[in-house]
Amino acid sequence: MLHVSRLLANGGVKNLCDKFKVKIKNYTEHDLMVLNYESFERDRDHPVVVECRGLILNSRTYAVVSRSFDRFFNFQELLQNIGGEDAHHKLFQSKENFKFYEKIDGSLIKIYKYNGEWHASTRGSAFAENLCVSDVTFKRLVLQALQLDEAHNQFQALCNEYLDCASTHMFELTSKHNRIVTVYDEQPTLWYLASRNNETGDYFYCSNLPFCKYPKCYEFTSVQECVEHAAQLKNLEEGFVVYDKNNAPLCKIKSDVYLNMHKNQSRAENPTKLAQLVINGEHDDFLALFPHLKSVIKPYVDARNTFTNESTINIMVSGLTLNQQRFNELVQTLPWKCLAYRCRKAQTIDVESEFLKLTEPEKIKMIKNIIKFVSTKQALNNKLAPTIKLPSSKQLLVLIGISGSGKSTYAKSLKGYTEINRDDVRVKLFLNGDYTKLNAFYNQSRKCRQTKEEQITKMCIEQFLKAAKCGANVVVSDTNLNTQSVDMWQKMAATHNYHFLTRLMDVSLETALERNYKRSDKFPLNPETIKKQYKKFLKVNNFEYYVPVGDKFPRAVLCDLDGTVALPTNRSFYDFDNRVAQDEARLDVITCVKYLANCHDAIIVFMSGRSVICEQPTRNWIEKYFDIKSYKLFMRPSDDTCKDYLLKLKLFNNYIRGKYNVIAVFDDRPCVVRMWQDLKIPTVFNVCRDYLEF
């Protein structure tokens, strides 16, 4: 009995997954399960893990249905004593004669018999039903490789004639549809590897199968000779597989050229690397090597070309003639709207030049956002197309924003619109018209509120249907920060032939909190609730979080001045003159800043709300108390009067983002601290001496 079967019989599936991170794919209707190890599991050479390489078991009895190769390792891993003592001893200490075969660079295919019928499977599936890159199933490719027209009957007859029904027969499949690195014939081809008895696990070799090819066999005198030969491979050949005398594979020896190419090809699995490939103009060279991945690269190329295509230019030509409000409405749903605002500020239609000014992480994020936007739009069009008959002049406008962002005020300013608001419905249904009781309503348990919320949703829909019957425009003025509510209204709009629009009510958290305190006519909401809403809104609004830029860039510790390390003694916080040199130093905080910077070999970057007019005395103070010569100082421009947290965000975007790996930030002002935390700076030290906002 296999180790894994014994473990399953004693501890069940959960024990296997939790302890060894084995992935299981179940086929309930066939009583089958496919087991595969996690590539980077720390117990990679444990007997249980080693057995789980596309192993197929009966999910009721845990008996073996199809038994593939056990896990075997790369030569370099065996040099590090990974792979178990048995393989290591055989390879390096025994005098056994090995067999060396060409390593075929394709997809593992296993053919086995179950419940009286033969089946083809891949490592991750029981019936080869999974798709390759070009959306062809592997089962279809296997049948093409066998040149079978009447697929099922001919496949059964062929297998019955040539294959042992008590064993699993392993092949490598190559074709243009599943190319990895090495180039083979475009037509699907099966390469025979070995066969294995399902019960005993013994390997054997079938040397005269007429429907497949065989890897080339080499007569190297030693493993070392094979390693040296692999180092000389130049034409994308993968390398070799070393087998013992019993036809069991011991290790893979791969060429350096292949490994480098495989690393490049694997970029196609990573959206960030694909975006980087296109941004750097390397995609043509990449496709010259891997033409079968053209469909994978195309969306990224299309996204990159967004900034020069005619529709983008037309949007900007039109946008520059509009007032600010109309411009906001025009660009609010665009995935490149930040570039649109930059173009408006510069009074240019050259979106491409504004894109080129972005840092590489910003460019990558924008390319990915465009792809996401296009795919979502296409999916929505496909889903809703049958329900949309004619363009409609009726509008369903959904406002999205936190409490205190002005949604209700804006909704009431729209003439001829029916407003739908969940709070209004809550108060009407359950609170006898008393808005001051809403906080108590919100404080009820989720379970207690669930039925009531369902009634509220039902009444909101009834209000919409009533408005739709009259042909009235509708505005929904809730927060709408979850996708479920927006999706619901979008479907309602499509069903009732409404033009669906959303509008982001973008205000600062501080503004919303200030408005909340003034809402004596209704109710002041719990401020913590608004803060939680704001966190959700940042995601909805595609807020650009901080992303480390890689080891090639310097590390930085960011530090505020006034209140954080410097305390005014002879001036107010808003006096920017030579008196800043007289500020008292917070030596304990300064010590922490310097220590953290030294530990991480980081530069200290000062981000100050002070006006640049007092730059020199500020530098003198820094050099006196920090005792450093190498640092950066960014200050408020002399004509800038924006709030402190907005200034710090601008300084961060202009001078830090994409240029430094930020270790931590020190600040004392609550609203600024929240801004740093919103950016997801790894560590934010709040050193304020009082919890009050100022």
UniProtKB/Swiss-Prot annotation:
Residues 394-694 are annotated as: Bifunctional 5'-OH polynucleotide kinase/polynucleotide 3'-phosphatase. GO terms for biological process: RNA repair. It catalyses: a 5'-end dephospho-2'-deoxyribonucleoside-DNA + ATP = a 5'-end 5'-phospho-2'-deoxyribonucleoside-DNA + ADP + H(+); ATP + (ribonucleotide)n-3'-hydroxyl + 5'-phospho-(ribonucleotide)m = (ribonucleotide)n+m + AMP + diphosphate. Its EC number is 2.7.1.78, 6.5.1.3. GO terms for molecular function: ATP binding; ATP-dependent polydeoxyribonucleotide 5'-hydroxyl-kinase activity; RNA ligase (ATP) activity. ATP binds at residues 401-408. Residues 1-385 are annotated as: Ligase domain. It holds the Pfam family HAD_PNKP. InterPro entries: HAD-like_sf, HAD_PNKP, HAD_sf, P-loop_NTPase, T4-Rnl1-like_N. Keywords: ATP-binding, Kinase, Ligase, Multifunctional enzyme, Nucleotide-binding, RNA repair, Transferase. Trifunctional enzyme that possesses a bifunctional polynucleotide kinase/phosphatase activity and an ATP-dependent RNA ligase activity. May therefore play a role to evade an RNA damage-based host response. This is Putative bifunctional polynucleotide kinase/RNA ligase.
